[in-house]
Amino acid sequence: MENTNQFLGTERVGKLMRRYAVPCIISLLVGALYNIVDQIFIANASYLGSYGNAANTVVFPLTVVALAIAVMIGDGCCAFVSISLGKGEVGEARKSVGSVVVLSAASSLVLTALYLIFADAIISMFGGTVNEETFRYAQEYFFYISLGIPFYMFGQAMNPVIRADGDPRFAMISTLAGAVLNIILDPIFIFECKWGMMGAAVATVLGQIVTAVLAVWYLCRMKTVKPGKGDFRLHASLCTRMLTLGITSFLSQISLVAAMAAINNMLRKYGALDEIFSQEQYAQIPMAVVGIVMKFFQIVISIVVGMAAGCIPVVGYNMGAGKKTRVRELFTKLLLCEAIVGAVALVLAEGFPRQLIAVFGAANESSYYTDFAIKAFRTYLCMMVLACVNKACFIFLQAVGKAFSSTMLSMIREVVFGMGFALLLPRFFGLDGVLYSMPVSDVLTFVIAAVMIVKTYRELNTEGAAVL
């Protein structure tokens, strides 16, 4: 089969960034909207309110576990396919796509079974016992979300593979179709049918099914790396290489889950010691508030990750073809764009927190909810620029084949700093300590990331001149 991706090594870098990054950003934003839209409609339903918001916050990390596995498989395959095409090894690329289908199906079924069997214990582990209402809502939401895990994981795993095949537009459309259906069904199920948390979850699952079906349709019509019947099996050596390339994506997401578990439990623990939030009717507020702050953060990070991940096929192809100058140029543009995104997000979080929380039903809540939410936005997100640059650095290192460096940097951010400070700082500052944990982590991570950025520039500088 002819390699039709040669333009990745000749087209202007800026044009390639727009072509690949924009659809990827939209895909990730739309994917993020599943949970965000659920939370918006849940929060604005007076019969659910902050209890439903808190329940959504409890369950959200558990969907991230599924996403972590899916992106490890999909991003790893995307990088592998791009590098293989750059080397002219189309057959290897086809085999890797077949392995993705089998691997995503098997892993999603195992995860679904674990979620259904150990649901109550898992919900408790992620802070769902803050009060009885929150636990009950979390149980209901988690059950139906678990049933959709196989569709969700397959759609997410195939999305980067479709981009690597040279059709980022279809990758965007498949995700957009499911999200649009979710947005349409959410208000119908929550407000008209009064299905509550079940309605939000069912709307989400139906949207995920649509995305998965479209991914199957594309799989049968792939342009460059369509697998043959014999390719639909687990090729051990290829799987190892793919998962190695995708391990950073996995650890980045899964370590975020660990950090969120720590944060949720610290909110529950130190909220119980607070004069206001120790009262039963207000106990869920800290968790609900941090949940909406994280949703805003998720929107921003979707743009950041989409921009960087969208460049993976371009980086992989040019690295495989030995065109380091083009890779260096792309890295420079990427860092600049990510810093701009972070600056815009910072202005919104610091200058307009009241307007942001109003989207999540603040009108139905007490002044304690609003006051804590404003403080959370301004404190938790005060280092957004550094957070965006850090994230871009993680993904770019992965794209150029430095899986170990990327993995270590990601783990240091989320586990050593993120989880560590989430557990440590509340001992000294109470609930405020949870809010301080993110900016402190981002500053310390940037110090390490800056060293990696300089080193990467030097390695990509084929003429040996200093770049930074």
Task: Tell me the role of every PLM-derived stretch.
Residues 50-61, 138, 142, 201, ...:
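Small-residue hotspots at the loop-to-helix junctions and early N-terminal turns
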Residues 1-21, 81-148, 192-247, 315-383, ...:
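Short alpha-helical transmembrane segments in multi-pass integral membrane proteins
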Residues 53-113, 152-171, 287-347, 351-353, ...:
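Small-residue-rich hydrophobic transmembrane alpha-helices
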Residues 14-33, 37, 62-69, 147, ...:
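Residue-level signal for short hydrophobic patches within transmembrane helices
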Residues 29, 33-54, 123-132, 188-194, ...:
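Helix-terminus/linker motif at the lipid-water interface of multi-pass membrane proteins
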Residues 24, 28, 40, 79, ...:
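Transmembrane alpha-helix boundary and packing residues in multipass membrane permease domains
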Residues 19-38, 144, 178, 207-211, ...:
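Transmembrane helical elements of multi-pass membrane transporters/channels
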Residues 27, 145-163, 171-179, 200-213, ...:
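Short runs within selected transmembrane alpha-helices of multi-pass transporters and secretion channels
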